[in-house]
């Protein structure tokens, strides 16, 4: 197990050695708290876009289902007749220049895996740049939009936001509740009291402190042909290789178990790069991976490689709340 994976496991399971990192945690907390205070006071300048900006992110290290939720938000806003754009850091991307407009035909190396997935799924205009405010300005200069979704960027205070949605893995919660490097928190837990909504991935019902949503498997999609198959394509008990290079691989493996398959788990680091050699497993079995990983593997995929398409399903209470926020942010807009 890599050092990063061991540290992640310790943050969520607890380990006495983490106490040694508390002096560094105290320093980290002071830095992030002062940074936020400077922007709130106006001491540090932030850019406010001429259209509403909704930040979708988390305060923890590790997967929370952010990309499926962004896909849901895009489609939901479109059903309201809104023109939506997305900005993202583009983690791991190596574009020719910044900001960079992501197109569906680009490679994951150039565009980043999550931005490419979003564009291939939705065709939404999407700009990547670690400087999210610059990405927003470039996106708005390229075409008229009603609304901007910021993929992650909770801690990027240079971009002013009108709504903050924070996602949390309901099973793992906030881990040991401590900030980096003694725990998984990017910001102190008190930050949750300031956001507009908290969504718990995998919660069985809404809570007083936030809304529930879950990820629903919808189909198997062949990497080479794009063919979609129902989830009963594999019989119960089917053994298969399971590949997940995401923030919480075990959630993906548990999903496959819940479909009554027998996955042989192959966890990789989040945003890992793949090759035919790194995925040449024995024995020979069908291979199922996440959609985020699939965008990096189509060029060398075998005939029996599939990805599991999933959809985010928030509760009716969240849908109603979110629609009320859209009406507040865009009072002149009429739903078709």
UniProtKB/Swiss-Prot annotation:
Q: Which domain of life is it from?
A: Bacteria
* Enzyme category, top tier: transferase
Q: Name one GO biological process term.
A: lipid A biosynthetic process
Q: Which reaction does it catalyse?
A: a lipid A disaccharide + ATP = a lipid IVA + ADP + H(+)
Pathway participation: Glycolipid biosynthesis; lipid IV(A) biosynthesis; lipid IV(A) from (3R)-3-hydroxytetradecanoyl-[acyl-carrier-protein] and UDP-N-acetyl-alpha-D-glucosamine: step 6/6
One GO cellular component term, please give it.
Answer: plasma membrane
Q: What are this entry's molecular-function GO terms?
A: ATP binding; tetraacyldisaccharide 4'-kinase activity
Q: What is its EC number?
A: 2.7.1.130
Residues that hold ATP according to the record: 60-67
Recorded hits in InterPro entries, A to Z, give: LpxK, P-loop_NTPase
Listed Pfam families:
LpxK
Q: Give the UniProt keywords, A-Z.
A: ATP-binding, Kinase, Lipid A biosynthesis, Lipid biosynthesis, Lipid metabolism, Nucleotide-binding, Transferase
Protein role = Transfers the gamma-phosphate of ATP to the 4'-position of a tetraacyldisaccharide 1-phosphate intermediate (termed DS-1-P) to form tetraacyldisaccharide 1,4'-bis-phosphate (lipid IVA).
Protein family per UniProt: Belongs to the LpxK family.
Quote the PANTHER family the UniProt record gives: TETRAACYLDISACCHARIDE 4'-KINASE, TETRAACYLDISACCHARIDE 4'-KINASE, MITOCHONDRIAL-RELATED
Q: What is this protein called?
A: Tetraacyldisaccharide 4'-kinase
Organism this protein belongs to: Pseudomonas putida (strain W619)
- What gene makes this protein? lpxK
